[in-house]
Amino acid sequence: MKRGKTAVIVGAQWGDEGKGKIVDVLSHNFSIVARYAGGHNAGHTVIIKGKKFVLQLVPCGVLRKGCRSVIGNGVVLDPLAFLKEVKMLRDAGVQVDGNLFVSNRAHVILPYHRMIEMGAENAPGRVKIGTTSRGIGPAYEDKMGRRGLRVADLLDSKLLKSTIENACREKNMIAHALFNSEPLDADSMYAEYAEAAKQIAPFVADTAVLLNQALAEGGSVMFEGAQATMLDIDHGTYPFVTSSSCTAGGAATGTGVPPNAIQNVIGITKAYCTRVGGGPFPSEVEGAVADQLRARGNEYGAVTGRPRRCGWIDLPLLRYAQMINGVNWWVVTKLDVLDVLDEVPVCVGYKIKGKKYDSVPALATGFEQVEPVYEKMPGWKKSTEGVASFDDLPKKAQEYLRFIERESGAKIGMVSTGPDRDQTMLLPEFEAEIIHPVEKHPLEKAAPKGAKAK
């Protein structure tokens, strides 16, 4: 039987490219949106008719009627953050019950993960990565060290209690010795998370079964990435990266669908570039130009509120992202931010000690030595905000986009010209290939047989 259509949404830069908006725009064409990596360190912002939603764990598809949402096994779940987000959605009138499923194999973030991360980030002499201090990294460390607690384990009260008691003994000792941290109380932690487990239980399912059965029945799935290519644990600017596989390859391992089920990879890039926290950023600019980009683009973290570092679009980086992810379509966001510029520099290559490179260095130290090579393109000095057709864009804006397309290895399928859901243009070829009516919703009534956690 032919599987339903699939697409992965992946960030091509250092995150904050606008993935949440794009998932929201496209989600009405898919039966399911599945999140496959990261935790509540990723803030995806969606604006619908002026109303702002910031989703950190729940996939953005939850905001579309008829679209089901899945939190996959590759995600690390903070139960309290999840329940807070569910409450926010319910209060806003969003239907989550029966529409939202959490993998029973997803790992759980507990207070000692936050304690360890905060201590490590603030320890003297340690390289500051710029984490959100929400316990993401330590939770993944426990997962890889086979010490983690999964959502299925969270629902087993005896296992939950013994895991918390054993972990608190170990983590308290480590945190006190290394960071002089105050100890955490295992009994109060167990009481709080045992109660949270009761509230989470109705959402828990074997989501790998759920997703594969939906695809087999002709349902369509969009895989929602978190963070971005250059923050990927393997392919990013290590060690200034996140702790999960946030490239397109993570969609299969992070949800339990087979790799050959992935049909399209849609890479999201801003019309310029930003980064939060430490780490190399070859095309970064400072001063008045950075302030202008930051102000026009509202470049502040959706989760932390931290100001983002700003710079010009980096084509070697985009080519790298295209190669690693197999991107076959680009979505360019925040084009309107550049409307006021007389000229728009584009990083077309790198120099290291006078030698030209057009690829991305493996070492962060190599990245820090990079001197960007720029080609300056003329600005268009006209508003693109809300423009709905490519042909209606200013000529110079069209040329800018075609240059990016020509030099980056994939076609542009969508352009975002404002923050609202409706301020988005779809190019005809992309629309013909990706946009399609959803004829059936395999999850309309309940999780399929065999999906519900025991």
Named regions from a protein language model:
Residues 1-454:
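Non-transmembrane, aqueous-exposed alpha-helical and coiled segments at domain scale
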